[in-house]
Amino acid sequence: MKIIGLTGSIAMGKSTVADFFRQAGISVFSADEAVYKLYKSEPTLSLIEYKFPGVFENGKVNRQKLSEILINDNEKLQTLEKIIHPLVQEKEKKFIDTARQQGEKLVVLDIPLLLETKGEKRVDSVVVVSAPLAIQKERAMIRQNMSEKKFAFINGRQMSDEKKRARADFIIDTGKDLENTREQVLFVIKSLLKN
C-alpha cells in the first residue's frame, strides 16, 4: 500500500484536494478532522480544561478563545501540541492499519504540518497543495473567525510554500478552476498506482 502525505499551507485548497481524492475512491485521513473530534471527547477535554482554563463554553472547547491564547503564547501552543499530536498519530496509525487490512492500494494522510513535523518519513510520496499568495490570502480572509493577525500567525508557523514545493514529489496548483485541480489529483493517483 502506498501512503500519500498531503500538505500545504492555510487556505491553499487542501480540503478540496482531499475531497477529490475521496471522490476518486481513495481513503483520506484528515489530521484536522481528528483534532476537531478530539476537542469533543474525553480524556482530551479534561486535559485541555486543566491546562487552558476559561476556554470552555457549554461543555465544549471554544476554539476561538483557544486560538486567541495560542497566538499570544508559544509555550501554551507547545503544551497543546503535546496533548493533541500523540492522540492524532494514534488515530492515524489505526487508519493505516485498517486500510492495509482492507487491501487498499493507496491512501492519503492530510496533514497540514507534515513537513514541519518530519512526517514525510511516514509516507511514500509528498503532495503539496499550492496557490498564489493573493488567492491564498483571499481564501483565508473569508473564513469565519479569521483575522489578519491570525492568518499571519498560522502562516508564520508553517514552512513557506516555496520550501514545501521544493520538497514535494507532486505539486497540485489550486490557483485555477476546480476541474483543473481535479485533473491534477487524478494524475497523481494514476501515476502512483502505475508504479
Curated annotation (Swiss-Prot):
<feature type="domain" description="DPCK">
    <location>
        <begin position="3"/>
        <end position="195"/>
    </location>
</feature>
<protein>
    <recommendedName>
        <fullName>Dephospho-CoA kinase</fullName>
        <ecNumber>2.7.1.24</ecNumber>
    </recommendedName>
</protein>
<keyword id="KW-0173">Coenzyme A biosynthesis</keyword>
<dbReference type="InterPro" id="IPR027417">
    <property type="entry name" value="P-loop_NTPase"/>
</dbReference>
<comment type="similarity">
    <text>Belongs to the CoaE family.</text>
</comment>
<dbReference type="GO" id="GO:0015937">
    <property type="term" value="P:coenzyme A biosynthetic process"/>
</dbReference>
<comment type="function">
    <text>Catalyzes the phosphorylation of the 3'-hydroxyl group of dephosphocoenzyme A to form coenzyme A.</text>
</comment>
<keyword id="KW-0418">Kinase</keyword>
<dbReference type="GO" id="GO:0005524">
    <property type="term" value="F:ATP binding"/>
</dbReference>
<dbReference type="Pfam" id="PF01121">
    <property type="entry name" value="CoaE"/>
</dbReference>
<dbReference type="GO" id="GO:0004140">
    <property type="term" value="F:dephospho-CoA kinase activity"/>
</dbReference>
<keyword id="KW-0808">Transferase</keyword>
<dbReference type="GO" id="GO:0005737">
    <property type="term" value="C:cytoplasm"/>
</dbReference>
<keyword id="KW-0067">ATP-binding</keyword>
<comment type="pathway">
    <text>Cofactor biosynthesis; coenzyme A biosynthesis; CoA from (R)-pantothenate: step 5/5.</text>
</comment>
<feature type="binding site">
    <location>
        <begin position="11"/>
        <end position="16"/>
    </location>
    <ligand>
        <name>ATP</name>
    </ligand>
</feature>
<keyword id="KW-0547">Nucleotide-binding</keyword>
<dbReference type="InterPro" id="IPR001977">
    <property type="entry name" value="Depp_CoAkinase"/>
</dbReference>
<keyword id="KW-0963">Cytoplasm</keyword>
